[in-house]
Swiss-Prot record:
Transmembrane segments: 135-155, 164-184, 269-289, 311-331
Keyword Transferase among record annotations: no
Organism of origin: Mus musculus (Mouse)
UniProt-recorded name of the protein: Fatty acid desaturase 3
Family named by the database record: Belongs to the fatty acid desaturase type 1 family.
Region span, Disordered: 1-21
Length: 449
């Protein structure tokens, strides 16, 4: 019999893919856990062990995204992020170095094997119901109503002139259009519209670049990490916001270390000054431009430039350069309010902390909640009120969330997982309550621990 990590044996060091036709080495979880370093990453997919150390930089979703699953069973993440599994498995073949020992469980640690099995059955049921197939008419109408709002805003200024009333009305319409662009490019980024990933990516570059002035690659870089590890510090960019705001476990950590860069016990108040008004206008604009320049995303930069050129050419004849800039700022501030409240109502009040190595379904449910649906809320939020379903199945077209929701509820009830649904206004208020609670925890730890 071979030793551990050898054909027929257990763990031992190995570099490079398994020789063609040779028996696969077998590994145990205790060995796999050792390979979660920046230059040494293994992961497990469908009980097979892959060494992604060198290939991670070539991963289309980015090295950080795939690296977040280092030394873990990434089977469900693999299925969640990819449409054409037959195609992407071709990239895995050269990375294969072995498989789990027969006596090793498919899941790592104390994860619930039955829960994982039932979730995979749930996904299969959704596939059998064709819930991953998009209604292209639905998305064509979404794009059409975005373009119609862009045209309507311009016609208001063209016909009524650049007065206060017409300018405010145009800014509101443009802000709604920009908000709906966020939703549509989000759908495209998850490859949930077209059957070919390439078509989704090209369409996303148009919507994100020409209609919004941002980089599609920048968005995907941030957003896919959020989906992989929601509400996990240093893995989810959306909650790695210290030292400006303290969320979850960071409140106690900062308090114990006597860190007081800002009056965090008042963060629920200064949130209104620097959160909703400035996120897209300042934070996103700067971060987005830096990403395009540092990562040399020149195509995205050209798309973004086309947005600014169109916007200023469209409105400068009425407002001049300064007035057009003020209109742009007004639109960004308005859409920023939408973005912060709508995207954070499902996450900020939930559990936020360090990596706990949960299974896919449990990790998503711990970090998300839903908001009660209605035709208006579904449209206004881009169906992000179905955040649980979206996080469990990122590539599912959003018009099918209502259909899969009963199956998800039954799954949660069976396994004692909290399927939380809130009224819309309650979800918004809970953001402030969560910030206040975190600030109070920080103050108590700062003063008494």
């Amino acid at each position: 019999m071979g030793g551990v990590g050898e054909p027929g044996g257990g763990p031992g060091p190995r570099e490079g893919p398994a020789p063609l036709g040779a028996p696969l080495p077998i590994f145990r979880w205790e060995q796999i856990r050792q390979h979660d370093l920046p230059g040494d990453k293994w992961l497990v997919i469908e009980r097979r062990v892959y060494d992604i150390s060198r290939w991670a930089q070539r991963h289309p979703g980015g090295s950080r995204l795939i690296g977040h699953h280092g030394a873990e069973d990434a089977t469900d993440a693999f299925h969640a992020f990819h449409q054409d599994l037959h195609f992407v498995r071709k990239f895995l073949k050269p990375l294969l170095i072995g498989e789990l020992a027969p006596e090793e469980p498919s899941q790592d640690g104390a994860q619930n094997a039955q829960l994982i099995e039932d979730f995979r059955a749930l996904r299969q049921a959704a596939e059998d119901m064709k819930l991953f197939e998009a209604d292209t008419t639905f998305f064509a109408l979404l794009l059409g109503h975005i373009l119609a709002m862009e045209l309507l805003a311009w016609l208001i200024i063209y016909l009524l002139g650049p007065g206060w009333v017409s300018s405010i009305l145009a800014a509101l319409i443009l802000a709604i259009s920009q908000a709906q662009c966020w939703c549509l490019q989000h759908d495209l980024g998850h490859a949930s519209i077209f059957t070919k990933s390439r078509w989704n990516h090209v369409a996303q570059q148009f919507v994100m670049g020409q209609l919004k002035g941002f980089s599609a690659h920048w968005w995907n870089f941030r957003h896919f990490q959020h989906h992989a590890k929601p509400n996990i510090f240093h893995k989810d960019p959306d909650v790695t916001v210290a030292p400006v705001f303290l969320l979850g476990e960071s409140s106690v950590e900062y308090g114990k270390k006597k860190r007081r860069y800002l009056p965090y016990n008042h963060q629920h108040l200064y949130f209104f000054l620097i959160g909703p008004p400035l996120l897209t206008l300042v934070n996103f604009e700067v971060e987005n431009l830096a990403y395009m320049l540092v990562c040399m995303q020149w195509t995205d930069l050209l798309w973004a430039a086309s947005f600014y050129s169109r916007f200023f050419l469209s409105y400068s004849p009425f407002y001049g350069a300064t007035g057009t800039l003020l209109l742009f700022v007004a639109v960004r501030v308005l859409e920023s309010h939408w973005f912060v409240w709508i995207t954070q109502m499902n996450h900020i009040p939930k559990e936020i902390g360090h990596e706990k190595h949960r299974d896919w379904a449990s990790s998503q449910l711990a970090a998300t909640c839903n908001v009660e649906p209605s035709l208006f809320i579904d449209w206004f939020s881009g169906h992000l009120n179905f955040q649980i379903e979206h996080h469990l199945f990122p590539t599912m077209p959003r018009h099918n969330y209502r259909r899969v929701a009963p199956l998800v509820k039954a799954f949660c009830a069976k396994h004692g997982l909290h399927y939380e649904v809130k009224p819309f206004l309650t979800a918004l208020v809970d953001i402030i309550g969560s910030l206040k609670k975190s600030g109070d925890i920080w103050l108590d730890a700062y003063l008494h621990q």
